[in-house]
């Protein structure tokens, strides 16, 4: 009889822990640290990126190979994170290796972006206005409404891959842009029609 009670107790405990872990995600906002510091000591060590936590609203698996984040900054340069809260336009969604809290450069990254209407490929030209009120950022799910294209973008990730969904509120042409983020102009894209694959390359440059 004792073994039955113990088994029942273990089952109830495991169920409670699993339920708690799921519910706790709703309290996590991965945008924390992407805005400038406003404390009394803000700017003590500099007035540029030193004022930021240098974090990013990434979706990822624990100990994953890479992660995905909205992109508001078009560069892999040192000390510039892919996303800052102050920015008003999103350029796409980046597969990133950014080291959170640091000042080393991103590397080997690429960005996906959807546009509608006239095709625009350059990051600053294709960037869409967005509102933080229409944005949701958790470790497992990110969503934002792209005002310029009347489309909602959603993404989630595994350790080496991601799943995207783009929902359009108007009819017409829609495009998916694949952009290797090489500041040295060394990135490239290959389209294999036979295998139905798109392969991208972006050589790594680290400081």
What does each model-found stretch correspond to?
Residues 16-20:
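Sec/Tat signal peptide C-region and signal peptidase I cleavage site
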Residues 6-14:
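Bacterial N-terminal signal peptides
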